[in-house]
Amino acid sequence: MREEKFYSVRMRASKNGSHEVGGKHLSGGERLTTYENMIHTVNALLEKGIYHSRGKPDFMKIQFECIDEPIQLVNPLHIETHEVESAEKGQVLARKLLEKAGIQKKMIDLAYEQIPECSGLRGAILFDIHSGKRIDQRKERGVRVSRMDWPDTNFDKWTKCYQMPRNSRIKEALVLATKVSEHPATIAELCWSDDPDYITGYVASKKLGYQRITKLKEYGNESGCRIFFVDGLRDLETYIDYLEKQPVFIQWEEENDA
């Protein structure tokens, strides 16, 4: 795997112009691929951006670059699904899971006050569990996790073992959550999609694994959330550099789950 050249491919799509001029963010995507599979990968991201429930884009950017750094191999987080009756009960459970991950209740309350800021962000908010403040200084951009993927053949093995659907949403979310949780500065992540037709979200951490919650908002709601609860005492610049630039492949091995 490491002898073969890989490329980071990124897509972002928006409506009413590009993100830089205030366009509405619709969709984004991240893949790692070989040069031979470039056309297939680009076409998949193109299709994702064009056929999106948030609307039809009038701006899209797809770019790729060669990866020169060694690719880190990471085992996926253990996954657990919680069936809940309503978004309200889902949010109560999410707060409990964040506490279980080691975050004080008052800090969780402060983080939830930041959620309106998440709407329309291309990336995540970094929330310091010590100060109770947002510390990424990225305003409407947020921090976008990049350079990550899960090879299809290995993902298929994982879905069969856990009897999970071969679902691109689950794959993309688990890839991102695993990369984020792998860094020691990450305490936990809280996320739900801005897609109006997708209401499932999750709480993830190295300690808890990937805790999938079936309802965290109502259908038709385009407000999403992605908050990384971080130890602000660690080097923030190094942490953001890892999130944005460190290439990571998810590689599941059955014996690692034993």
Curated annotation (Swiss-Prot):
Homodimer. It is an enzyme of class 6 (ligase). Belongs to the BioW family. InterPro entries: BioW (IPR005499). HAMAP family: BioW. One of its GO terms (biological process) is biotin biosynthetic process. It catalyses: heptanedioate + ATP + CoA = 6-carboxyhexanoyl-CoA + AMP + diphosphate. Keywords: ATP-binding, Biotin biosynthesis, Ligase, Magnesium, Nucleotide-binding. It comes from Bacillus atrophaeus (strain 1942). One of its GO terms (molecular function) is ATP binding. Pathway: Metabolic intermediate metabolism; pimeloyl-CoA biosynthesis; pimeloyl-CoA from pimelate: step 1/1. This is 6-carboxyhexanoate--CoA ligase. Its EC number is 6.2.1.14. Catalyzes the transformation of pimelate into pimeloyl-CoA with concomitant hydrolysis of ATP to AMP. Its cofactor is Mg(2+).
